[in-house]
Amino acid sequence: MQNRNTFSWVKEEMTRFISVSIMIYVITRTSISNAYPIFAQQGYENPREATGRIVCANCHLANKPVDIEVPQAVLPDTVFEAVVRIPYDMQLKQVLANGKKGALNVGAVLILPEGFELAPPDRISPELKEKMGNLSFQSYRPNKRNILVVGPVPGQKYSEIVFPILSPDPATKKDVHFLKYPIYVGGNRGRGQIYPDGSKSNNTVYNATAAGIVSRIVRKEKGGYEISIADASDGRQVVDIIPPGPELLVSEGESIKLDQPLTSNPNVGGFGQGDAEIVLQDPLRVQGLLFFLASVILAQIFLVLKKKQFEKVQLSEMNF
């Protein structure tokens, strides 16, 4: 009897463990599949196309500004900060996947020159850590450590993202040289309008797939609409499905054209990209410049002293 109770207890615990594991997997998978910039990482080997366009613009159709600030020059093996600003109106609310309104999230991709990478934690100063907040950065690919991504994160807290960057040392990396390099950045606020498979999200406008008369509009129980359009030429019925989120612009009995908007455009976000330049400076060149400036200053000082000495000699000769 005791063995039977023990077996029942073990069976119950195993069932509970498996159920919890499945729930965690489903929740995690769902959150990852809907997260920027996972889509870009899964679908593109390189986030920047040959034309210079960053692939995030394929899903985030609205064009919005983004700004990047980096030092003009850095020394080898030095940690510096790259500040990405993603401005937007903090009062705006976006349409969430369930059709409700919520705060905007932001994300960014930073494309550094080859050799530049995310600074290791032990090289980051306390001041820089405070500026970074609780952000978690990751490489776009294991073999592309110069391309960093972050997000989605709350836009109200992280509309300014600080990346800690470690510059390379040409003494240890022979493919790196003391040159001027470009840095590219892409930043989005809000959800995208198109998924990587080409399907629309509920954060975009929906157009009529046929011309005719709106014969019926059915409001679905979980939100959204089914719009039946009767083609005037052959009487064919076309049903357009509208997900929860966009506001309906048409009514029953209304005559509509092909591709006419059936809904408003709920998107309040967008994507932007920019660039900057940074110089990997040779320390010897800096030392040479300092030596040159010091020699110029000393020469000026000696010239002034010599001039004053000459004036004193002239004055004494005149007095004599």
Curated annotation (Swiss-Prot):
GO terms for MF: electron transfer activity; heme binding; iron ion binding
Protein residues bound to heme: Y36, C56, C59, H60
Keywords (A to Z) from UniProt: Chloroplast, Electron transport, Heme, Iron, Membrane, Metal-binding, Photosynthesis, Plastid, Signal, Thylakoid, Transmembrane, Transmembrane helix, Transport
Protein name in UniProt: Cytochrome f
Coiled-coil stretches: none
The keyword DNA-binding is annotated on this UniProt entry: no
UniProt organism field: Calycanthus floridus var. glaucus (Eastern sweetshrub)
Cofactor binding annotation: Binds 1 heme group covalently.
Membrane topology qualifier: Single-pass membrane protein
UniProt gene name: petA
Subunit structure: The 4 large subunits of the cytochrome b6-f complex are cytochrome b6, subunit IV (17 kDa polypeptide, petD), cytochrome f and the Rieske protein, while the 4 small subunits are PetG, PetL, PetM and PetN. The complex functions as a dimer.
Entry keyword Heme: yes
Main location: plastid
Recorded family membership: Belongs to the cytochrome f family.
